[in-house]
């Protein structure tokens, strides 16, 4: 008797609208294999209409405990357009250490109110395009531990996540990202964003990046946030009416020239913070650059100066 092959597969129960991911040797007839490359998963053609997009049928997703032994390489489009999806169970059994694409993974899951991706291993992911886009009912999302060092595309990543009141992207490594088109557009409940670690030297498109963030008051950024590679007509700050940085918001000035903390809408925060020290002694001033490196003397540009129990920023021209 031949041993059965252990494999990853997905079962769709149309009656209950439940999509179950498993990894064992008991793949039943009619089960689907995981998708590869940029292809839509096979369960869409079965659950949805002729376009291949599922809109109404999938209501629940379950990752069986057996799926903990699976090592998918691609999660793109897994749940895109699942407008009636309200719960995902067993997400802790999804090991993403070998995944390279999370493109549109949860996009347009408009009735999903909670999503725990805090255990995701994303060190090999290159594509996060539209990953959470239009998840308009999400009230919390923990992406604080995401390793984004290899990501190149963050277009639409949080687009229209209108019920998120906070979003911690302070540790995102964006040095390889080339596009952030409408990345935070329509995040109308956010009041602040910490982008102090964002290195945008390779980003060529930031169009609409913060468009419609109507309650966003503060964007923290460092010298690593630059727009030198973006086109001149890159309108970044449309309808950010509460935003205040070095200057208050002006609806007639929404372009890339306002993406700075000296004459624009950003508020300075060093990428590597230098904490203030407390002392009762008289001490000489110490100088650091914005990355926390000790200097022998002030240099041109922004300097961090520590003197006694005070830490201040000094711009040397």
Spans of features found by a protein language model:
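Short, ordered coil/turn segments that flank beta-strands lining enzyme active or ligand-binding pockets
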Residues: 15, 290-292, 307
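Negatively charged
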Residues: 2-271
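A short beta-strand micro-motif
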Residues: 10-11, 287, 305
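Residue-level detector of functionally pivotal "anchor" positions at catalytic/ligand-binding pockets or at interdomain
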Residues: 269-291
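A glycine-anchored, Pro-Gly-centered beta-turn/N-cap motif
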Residues: 299-303
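C-terminal tail/sorting-segment detector
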Residues: 304-317
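Short solvent-exposed loop/turn micro-motifs enriched in small/polar/acidic residues
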Residues: 4-5, 279-280, 298
């Amino acid at each position: 008797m031949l041993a059965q092959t252990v494999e990853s597969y997905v079962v769709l129960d149309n009656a209950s609208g439940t999509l179950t991911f498993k990894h064992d040797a008991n793949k039943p007839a009619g089960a689907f294999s995981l998708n590869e490359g940029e292809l839509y998963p096979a369960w869409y053609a079965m659950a949805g209409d002729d376009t291949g997009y599922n809109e109404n049928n999938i209501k629940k997703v379950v990752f069986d405990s057996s799926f903990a032994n699976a090592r998918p390489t691609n999660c793109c489009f897994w749940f895109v357009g699942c407008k009636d999806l309200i719960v995902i169970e067993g997400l802790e059994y999804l090991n993403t250490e070998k995944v390279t694409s999370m493109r549109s993974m949860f996009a347009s899951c408009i009735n999903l109110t909670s999503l725990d991706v805090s255990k995701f291993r994303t060190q090999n992911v290159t594509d996060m395009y539209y990953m959470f886009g239009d998840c308009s009912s999400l009230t919390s999302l923990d992406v604080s531990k995401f390793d984004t060092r290899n990501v190149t595309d963050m277009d639409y990543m949080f687009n229209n996540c209108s019920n998120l009141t906070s979003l911690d992207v302070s540790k995102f490594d964006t040095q390889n990202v080339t596009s952030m088109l409408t990345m935070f557009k329509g995040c109308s409940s956010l009041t602040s964003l910490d982008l102090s670690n964002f290195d945008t030297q390779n980003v060529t498109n930031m169009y609409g990046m913060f468009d419609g963030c109507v309650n966003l008051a503060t964007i923290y950024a460092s010298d690593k946030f630059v727009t030198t590679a973006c086109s001149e007509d890159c309108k970044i700050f449309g309808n950010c009416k509460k935003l205040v940085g070095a200057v208050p918001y002006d609806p007639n000035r929404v372009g890339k020239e306002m993406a700075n903390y000296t004459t624009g809408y950003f508020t300075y925060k060093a990428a590597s913070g230098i904490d203030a020290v407390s002392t009762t002694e008289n001490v000489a001033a110490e100088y650091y650059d914005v990355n926390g490196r000790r200097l022998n003397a002030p240099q041109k540009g922004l300097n961090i100066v520590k003197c006694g129990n005070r830490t201040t920023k000094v711009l040397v021209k």
